[in-house]
Amino acid sequence: MLRKLWQWFYEETESSDDVEVLTLKKFKGDLAYRRQEYQKALQEYSSISEKLSSTNFAMKRDVQEGQARCLAHLGRHMEALEIAANLENKATNTDHLTTVLYLQLAICSSLQNLEKTIFCLQKLISLHPFNPWNWGKLAEAYLNLGPALSAALASSQKQHSFTSSDKTIKSFFPHSGKDCLLCFPETLPESSLFSVEANSSNSQKNEKALTNIQNCMAEKRETVLIETQLKACASFIRTRLLLQFTQPQQTSFALERNLRTQQEIEDKMKGFSFKEDTLLLIAEVSVSLGFM
């Protein structure tokens, strides 16, 4: 009996009701997605996307969301983001917009783009400022963003250092080349010796400038780390306050998750170098503003 039921589900349905046929195709796409057969699911969704009536808003949204999620899993993130942006522009209420923002968050997380992930979370928090889990995700994103930005700055500094060093060497040996490998100072004309002395002075200036740049970049990296840590810390504090607020209303596994998350936040807060006075001030500001 069950086998016949599945056979009916997979066979093409000959029906005069187009809506019924399209609905069946959508369910096939949903099943393929659940089985992680993303290419097959995408084909099912795409086959009905253009056939849906312009008045069938609900199914059209569901199908487009399914397409975007499949594209993200298949590594086609830009196409997925285009669909998500289109859905965001057409959102008519808070529920629709929330669904779209969670879709964008999933795509950006899959893309591992921390800055876009943070932007999506900020928009979600603007809609739902008292959701502790979004605040927790925002804190984690900031926690990961700091080292990523610091590494990018370090890479930029390293590249600039190599470029500057190469220019210094070239200015010191302006005639360098394969024929100059056997040249010695005593074989060079007197004018070249004066040129070497002048270039030596320029080299010292270049090295000093390079050192100043390196110091500046190091300060910038430290500033970036402190700033992102401060934002992560503030978001963690906000998460903890909201969890404490909802704690009396919870029981069973919900309460267990709440308490476990609070303990995890407490452990992560110990990794910050902020003084207790600073943490108390952040908490006071968070309470007084109602949201951050």
UniProtKB/Swiss-Prot annotation:
Gene3D superfamilies found in the cross-reference section: Tetratricopeptide repeat domain
Pfam families, alphabetized: DUF5588
Superkingdom per UniProt: Eukaryota
Name assigned to this protein: Zinc fingers and homeoboxes protein 1, isoform 2
Source species of the chain: Homo sapiens
Lineage: Eukaryota, Metazoa, Chordata, Craniata, Vertebrata
